[in-house]
Amino acid sequence: MKKRIISLLLAAAMTFSLTACGGNSSDDKKEETKTENTENTDNKENKETPEVDTIHWGRANSGNILVTIAKQQGYFDEVGINVIEDPVESSTAALQALQAGQVDVTSNQGTNNPLQFISTGSDFSIVGGYMLKGMYIIGKKDTQYKDVTSLKGSKFAYAGVHPVVGMALLDAGIDPNNDVEWLTYSTNSDRLAAVVSGEADYAVLSGDQLYAVGNNDQIEIKAWLDDLVPNYGCCRMNMNTDFVKKNPTTVKLLLKSLIRAEQWYLANKEECVKILAKEIGAEEDYVAAYLLNDNYVSSVDPCKNSVVKTWDAMIKMGFIDQEDADKINIEDHINTELYKEALDECVAEYHDEDPDFYDGRVKFFEENDQ
């Protein structure tokens, strides 16, 4: 009974909460069929041929700037992949679509949501990432905040215990379930309003609210979640394990294109504001508020160590039933090999274009995935 109650609460929380990297739009059924590519790979340029040349990506309404850039710069075309973005209405809808094979990849559903699905039997593999960090805690300007210990005894607006905040509380010896009162609000805008009205002392918000926060003189950002749990791996890139096993070249080439897009994004952020604003139909000031923020950081890296830490913390906090966890080796659901192959090839082919970027990606992988 306890297990069923926890599962229902978690399902409700995921259904109504916005994703870590922004909300999602309406869900369209996938209509195209993947095209099996049977061309001979022994061509003049000796290019690899993807096993499947059409990828369906579950798209949140905040978009994925790396996918947009990879399309516009022709990186997907160069490796023979066509990425179709299919709108999904929520984190739960995105992961259910992935489970059903309606989409091939999702990237805007945080880390805890795909891990929750894995814990209940979904055979997903985390193969990369989108946002590394970018979420934050807000409070009224006159609310005294020193560090995570200031949250003890507070009223916190979120849909249940926030996993990253919960991890930080556990590290500080504070029981996240009993020492903080969690108030459930279904959207980021509702959580923001709860703090402004005084119903809640704090709230966790994502990048899509940075413009609103910056233009509200009653509140301020108290802490970035990365200050509490460094490199917590905000949004992971998820695929069905069976798809990854059958199409390793496709996945590697997809990651390779995204790594190149990440380099271009970091070198051209101002231009990316215009590109993404046009792509999602938003004002440039709104997009600039998060895309140009130094704390809003992308990374295609799988961040294996952070994923494992989040998994362990979710078990401690009751998000994942211990009996379910005992049946699963979470490392079997984190594929770092294909990302490493993609990164190695990028370094070999494009290192001279931006040595600092590629050296940094290699160092980051060594520190966060081994």
Predicted regions and their residues:
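Bilobed "Venus flytrap"/periplasmic-binding protein-like clamshell domains
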Residues: 50-74, 78, 136-140, 144, ...
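Pocket-lining segment of extracytoplasmic ligand-binding domains
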Residues: 112, 143, 182-183, 189-279
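Ligand-binding "clamshell"
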Residues: 50, 116-127, 176, 212-226
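Short beta-strand-to-loop elements that line the ligand-binding cleft
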Residues: 82-90, 107-109, 176-187
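Alpha-to-beta junction loops
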Residues: 81-84, 99-110, 120-124, 154-157, ...
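Bacterial lipoprotein signal-peptidase II cleavage site
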Residues: 18-39
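Secondary-structure end/capping motifs
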Residues: 246-325
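Conserved C-terminal helix/tail region of periplasmic/extracytoplasmic solute-binding proteins
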Residues: 316-370
